[in-house]
Design a protein with these regions (language model features):
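C-terminal coupling/interaction segments
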Residues: 2-5, 284-332
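Conserved ABC ATPase "signature" region
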Residues: 106, 110, 117-135
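Catalytic Walker B motif of ABC-type/P-loop ATPase nucleotide-binding domains
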Residues: 164-168
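Walker A (P-loop) phosphate-binding loop of ABC-type ATPase nucleotide-binding domains
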Residues: 45-49
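Conserved catalytic motifs of ABC-family nucleotide-binding domains
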Residues: 160
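ABC transporter nucleotide-binding domain
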Residues: 181-281
Length: 332
């Protein structure tokens, strides 16, 4: 069992050898993981088993085998109690078009057991928090995709849950809308102390937003670690330089100068506008930085960027693919 816990060793979600099999596919395969408080990302490609796991954790779909607990409650026998304490933002559009956000969220609050006055008060507060207060009386059918996502988020929060499941909350949003939604997700925990399990296939979003990340592929656990562990710095140094009249290809000039000093490099396309390509090399210490600085200065070029590369969550999938290919090779 891989653990993600706080210093207090509090577990919000726990699964042990959890499996879910359908006639032609295994959606979850002996998944064992513990998740602590905070914002946790659940990442995997479409079909990896993310939505299936959420449905099991909500007590909406039985597991084939294994067990799971949410907030200390067994999902097999305490589904209703779990749903009282947990909010859920589904992936797909499921909102009634002819009612206002206020009417819908009040209804969902009442369904959660809040009395009428408290439901209206909580709805107003929640819609203000998600940025829909000015538009709260308009029919949902006239909302943009981003506004509809905020309504779904509001109904997940209105009953003041201890934990929320957000299934692909940035789907259909433009870059600005995604950034705003990610900010809201982060504040759910920092401002209100609500733990979050958020699914996404956009790995960069999770790196920026989450405290911890759980990676699953084909229903199996690939890795479960803090985001800091996933994104540790590497020994690879990325440098980018400008061109000049004397050196129309500044990147090539730097590469040749470094090679002359016994430093191997390789290139990577995609530099900033007006700058050359990026060179990658292995940093062996401070002397590498000094050498690059001196080479660029001697050539009379501008240094646009010199930074250590970080690992990314996507490397977990690359490593998994490599291991599968190696296993197939050995099997042949």
């Amino acid at each position: 069992v891989v653990r993600i816990t706080t210093v207090e060793d509090v577990t919000v979600i726990a699964t042990e050898s959890l499996s879910k099999r359908f006639p032609r596919v295994t959606a979850l395969d002996r998944l064992s993981v513990d998740i602590g408080p905070g914002v946790t990302g659940l990442v995997g490609a479409n079909g990896a088993g993310k939505s299936t796991l959420i449905k099991i954790l909500l007590g909406l779909s039985p597991a084939t085998e294994g067990r799971a607990e949410v907030l200390g409650l067994d999902v097999a026998t305490k589904g209703a109690a779990i749903r009282e304490r947990v909010g859920y933002m589904p992936e797909h559009d499921c909102l009634p078009p002819d009612v206002s956000a206020t009417e819908f969220v009040v209804h969902m609050a009442r369904m959660s057991g809040l009395p009428p006055a408290a439901a209206r008060e909580r709805t107003a507060d929640t819609l203000r928090h998600v940025g829909l207060y000015e538009e709260r009386y308009r029919p949902i059918g006239g909302y943009s995709t981003g506004m509809k996502q905020r309504v779904k988020l509001a109904q997940a929060l209105v009953h003041d849950p201890q934990l929320v499941f957000l299934d692909e909350p940035t789907n259909g949003l433009d870059p600005v809308g995604r950034d705003e939604m990610l900010g809201l997700i982060r504040r759910i925990h920092t401002d209100f102390g609500i733990s979050v399990l958020v699914t996404s296939h956009l790995l960069g979003e999770l790196e920026r937003t989450c405290d911890h990340v759980v990676v699953i592929d084909g229903g199996k656990l690939l890795r479960s670690s803090s985001t800091t562990d996933f994104t540790q710095t590497t020994t690879t140094l990325a440098i980018e330089v400008t061109d000049s009249d004397a050196h129309p290809d500044g990147t090539r000039a730097v590469r040749e100068a470094l090679h002359a000093r016994g430093v191997d490099t390789h290139g990577e396309a995609g530099g900033l506008p007006g700058a050359g390509h990026i060179l990658l090399l292995t940093a062996t210490g401070e002397e590498t930085y000094d050498l690059v600085r001196d080479v660029v200065a001697d050539l009379g070029l501008g240094l646009v960027r010199m930074e250590q590369r970080r690992h990314h969550i996507s490397e977990v999938f690359t490593s998994s693919d490599d291991q599968r290919k190696e296993a197939v090779g050995h099997g042949g």
